[in-house]
Regions:
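Catalytic-core helical/loop segments in enzymes performing group transfer/polymerization on anionic/lipid-linked
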Residues: 1-462
Length: 462
């Protein structure tokens, strides 16, 4: 039976975490903090994702669990190890095409180009015929050799947490099941990456998203390999895994955060510094490594176009909002209405019903930059596309009424990157009557000039 998912605002989840995870002893072992692992588990419980409760052996005594892993190693032989170079890039596989039709990694292309090919290994998460990765994670089996001392040391640390979890009255039975499942996933991920990087010449690994990558970071820390995160989207004070409040000060140390994080501009560094998870020196302003064209927008390029930038897995909300625009479409027949789908949208068919209502649905046919050059107004809820629009002479509107996203939407307005918009408002009339048409933020604060030396130093620093 499928889960009945009840998505909750991040603001509410953050309050819940601050209340139930304020005591770091609940998730801290002798040498590690499993704060983020507990966050994953409790998030799934809160939203009703109970299929995330997995069969596992985390409650077994360490000796029994170790014996079981040794037996599995005999039955399931591990495949030969990949040969890796000094710097490894783990690419999520989001690609962008150039004018000649060639495909490039939107996140990793420029970072990879910093090093000679014989010094790097470019690994994709999944095989993609459009780009030549050195290897892909989905092609590597999860069969392991018998656990060595370092693996067993971590298993003992996890077992400390398991004992605490099972004996405390702080958690419900279902929450305990989620926590043990999350620890199981963490340990399996750790073993996967430990196998991948053990006895290799690797010095640094670059990836996006430190959250849900705790097993990777644990393996790198165990092996003395530098871990570097590069920013892949917006960072907000309302995030679940960034800008941790002082409530978590006792639980942040050794909580599987990367050694450094590269951000697009000083704007993002200022936000991150409000949290307790990174020190100033760990946050490196490396500039805009994404592929944006030079911005030379003139008034004559602008058209009477409204760009609605949809967000991943929010098709229900955006389709409903588009239908509510019917009065304004009829009131402004000389305006064009464009909906740009998120590149990772899984339910693109949901938008097809809007075509008869004068909406142009765009997937990969045109780049975001080309659309921003032409449109006068952009509408979304919370999105990096608001920041992408800086310098393009676009009026950004953030819809404020989608309940579970209202905290993020409010943040967009508070940060000065978008103006508030109610579902009932005519966006064209509102834009025409604004005293100030574009956000006060400067593009260079958000996307500073690419600093190749800063990024290279962040990746290689010991």
């Amino acid at each position: 039976m499928a889960d009945k998912i009840h998505i909750q605002p991040f603001e509410k989840l953050n309050r819940f975490f601050e209340e139930c995870l304020s005591d770091a002893q609940l998730y801290r072992s002798s040498n590690y903090s499993f704060l983020k692992v507990f966050q994953h588990a409790l998030s799934y419980d809160q939203i009703g994702a109970h299929s995330r409760v997995l069969k596992n052996y985390m409650a077994w005594p360490v000796w029994a669990h170790a014996a079981f892993l040794r037996l599995k190693a005999i039955v399931r032989k591990s495949s030969p190890q990949l040969a890796l170079h000094e710097v490894v890039f783990i690419d999520p596989g989001r690609l962008v095409s150039d004018e000649s039709g060639g495909w490039h990694s939107i996140y990793m292309q420029k970072a990879v180009s910093l090093f000679p090919r014989n010094q790097i290994s470019h690994i994709g998460k999944k095989k993609d015929s459009r780009i030549a990765f050195n290897a892909t994670l989905d092609s590597i089996d999860r069969n392991y050799s018998a656990p060595d001392k370092l693996e067993l040391d971590l298993l003992r640390e996890i077992h400390e947490i398991v004992v605490k979890t099972k004996t405390t009255t702080h958690w419900s039975a279902l929450q305990k099941a989620h926590i043990l499942s999350a620890l199981h996933v963490f340990f399996d991920d750790f073993r996967f990456y430990y196998k991948l990087f053990k006895n290799q010449p690797v010095k640094s690994v670059v990836f996006i998203s430190h959250y849900h990558n705790e097993g990777l970071i644990a393996a790198l820390q165990t092996l003395g390999i530098r871990s570097v995160e590069i920013q892949h989207g917006l960072i907000s004070a309302n995030d679940l895994y960034y800008v941790y409040s002082s409530v978590f000060s006792a639980g942040i140390k050794n909580a599987f955060f990367p050694d450094a994080i590269c951000v697009y501009g000083n704007y993002w560094k200022i936000i991150l510094k409000k949290g307790v998870e990174f020190t100033d020196s760990q946050i490196v302003v490396s500039g805009d490594y994404l592929q944006h064209p030079e911005i030379t927008v003139s008034r004559t390029e602008k058209q009477k176009s409204i760009l609605i930038c949809a967000q991943k897995n929010m098709h229900d909300e955006y389709v409903e909002y588009a239908h509510s625009l019917k009065p304004w479409i009829e009131a402004h027949p000389d305006w064009n209405w464009i909906i740009k789908l998120h590149p990772l949208e899984k339910n693109k068919q949901a938008y097809e019903e809007l075509k008869p209502f004068n909406f142009e649905i765009i997937d990969h046919q045109r780049s975001l930059d080309s659309l921003l050059r032409e449109c006068s107004i952009q509408i979304s809820v919370y999105s990096t596309t608001f920041f992408d629009a800086l310098g393009f002479d676009v009026t950004n509107f953030s819809i404020q009424q989608f309940g579970m996203y209202r905290d993020y939407a409010a943040q967009m307005v508070e940060e000065g990157v978008a103006f508030p918009l109610l579902v009932s408002e005519d966006p064209i009339e509102k834009a025409l009557n604004l005293q100030v048409k574009t956000p006060p933020l400067e593009r260079h604060d958000v996307y500073s000039q690419l600093d190749m030396n800063a990024m290279r130093k962040a990746i290689l620093s010991s």
